[in-house]
Amino acid sequence: FWYPPALMHMAKADRLLMLIGGVDLVVGPLLTLIVYKANKRHLKFDLASIGLIQVVFLGYGLYTIWNSRPVFLVAVPDRFELVFANEITPKRLAEAKIERFKTLSFGKPILVGAPMPSSIKERDDIMNSAVTGQGDIQAMPKYYVDYSSTVKNLLKHAKPLNSGKDLSIANAKVLQQAAKSYGFRPDDIRYLTLASSRGFAVTLVDANSGAILGHVDADP
């Protein structure tokens, strides 16, 4: 729902789900094994307590997934950045100049652009924020604009699906096969790096319109 299948591994969502499921499945049976005795006086209470513990673990796990869900897919000058809910502070969210970008997505990530400002001071502020671990431009909604307004510049950095200095033969085959699986000819597709704080993947875009066609779990 929040994570496209191709981005599950890149966003580490698969590990989180396995951890939550593993803990919940192990904790219940293990505790039951420890406390279970057929004629134990307080067995029902103990089993109910174990059930409650499992529910608490599950609830915390779901909250963690919710709080770390992807909320914005941001086109910065030369790539895409996937931004998670816990990476944008309420203060920065409130600074968004476009009203619909003041709310974190409840469903799939919202596609936006984030061009670098022309002001040298603002550029310096962004750089300082990035190097001090307080977030780069992709975590600053006040710079968000409609994706369509950034497409022309973004496509200048998009690359063809041919092998070359930027793409190994193996990865070229993976991307070309992915393009075909999405129903497109490789020659009509370009690719861009999709980065996040958790890993990397590749985003396929239409070579002319810049429309996003899909994501590929591949090393850019």
Task: Map each language-model feature to its residues.
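Membrane-embedded alpha-helical segments of integral membrane proteins
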Residues: 1-35
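Intrinsically disordered, low-complexity segments enriched in polar/charged residues with Gly/Pro
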Residues: 5, 58-61, 188-192
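Short extracytoplasmic/periplasmic juxtamembrane "stem" segments immediately C-terminal to an N-terminal membrane anchor
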Residues: 16-17, 74-90
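Alpha-helical transmembrane segments of integral membrane proteins
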Residues: 18, 45-51
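Transmembrane alpha-helices and immediately adjacent membrane-cytoplasm interface residues
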Residues: 30-39, 49-77, 82
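Extracytosolic and intramembrane catalytic regions of membrane-associated proteins
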Residues: 91-220
